[in-house]
Amino acid sequence: MQKILISLSVILLLSFCDGNKKNSSFQLKGTLSDSKAETLYLEKLGSSKQVIIDSVILDENGNFEFTNYTPKIGFYRIKTNDKNFAMLVLDSADKVTITGSVKDLGNTFKVEGSPETTIFIEYNNLSKSRDIKLDSLNKEFQVLMETNKMDSIRMDSLSAIFEAPYNSIINRTNTLMVDKISKNTNMYSSIMAIQALDPDKYSDLYKSLDAGLSKKFPNDKNVIMFHEVVERMLSTNIGQFAPEISLPSPDGKEIALSSLKGKLVLIDFWASWCGPCRKEMPNVVKIYSKFKNKGFEIYGVSLDQDKEKWMEAITKDGINWPQVSDLKYWDNVAARIYNVQGIPYTVLIDKDGKIIAKNLRGQELEKKIAEVLK
């Protein structure tokens, strides 16, 4: 039920596209209640920074209009401060009107004249509904844990009971999200929405969105970067030959993935700081012990930054298979090549070097390995 994720938005919003001085028919205006001459800011969003590009003081009736900026397609927000804001997806041809309360922009604002923002809100509402249900389920689980003293066996049993409704909530939301994205493959907002979906499971939808966005926004940097993500994803689909990677081991010796060809190889992406990875590691150790003399090998790739902590985890967890890392965290070259969006993450490669399974863990992984090696 747990996994450390890297948001796809981090990948997609690395570039920062500037807009232009006001030179088109673009409009962004509105009326906000509860106004006391507050200053309202228009901000362009990037992955690591936000830049204020315009500001306006609301008049005595709460009216405002931004007049100094024409946006390129992208993600923006209006705000009074960093805790009171509303997200927008704006384009240069929009004529946008916003209403709501200046005291609570995020929960009260309504927008007209921005098709992209309208779709973005619909996506966001799906995510909010999912998160509310998951939060309620988690609180129920925590209450049962706190009011009942449980051994590990009973704890696992309780977790199994809650896993079904958890998966039901996720699957229901994913079904609705897939349906909406499928109908909006030319909408820029879909870039953010699709990050909630597993690229391995929904590769066809990623391809459709890539095609739609590339046709409509061929020169947009974020769309170009999304295309590159999809290209990497396709190159590591099941049935493809595993791309080569070669990284240093803890002692500095380069170990190439291809050096293990001829064996059934599991690429195991993990990190010492990743709780779910460490929790899964005893199972990986058990699997390795069971199959290592039967033509099975593991190529461990750590997304660590701190070499000492990486080596401590190797020792503490009893890891005795090949381990490599460039100590570059999420910028790890192997993670980029294999389009890793979250850890733990696994890729199973047959003796000929072809990818035969992805993201298996626990009993599913052990069963698949036994099946291939029999």
Feature locations, PLM:
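C-terminal motif of bacterial Sec signal peptides marking the signal peptidase cleavage site
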Residues: L14-F16
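A non-transmembrane, solvent-exposed segment enriched in polar/low-complexity residues
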Residues: D18-T175
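N-terminal targeting signals for export/organelle localization
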Residues: G106, S159, N167-F241
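N-terminal "domain-start" segment that seeds a small globular fold
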Residues: I224-S258, W321, K368-A370, K374
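Conserved redox-active cysteine motifs that mediate thiol-disulfide chemistry
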Residues: K261-G262, F269-K286
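Conserved helix-turn-beta segment immediately C-terminal to the redox Cys motif
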Residues: K279-V301, E371-K374
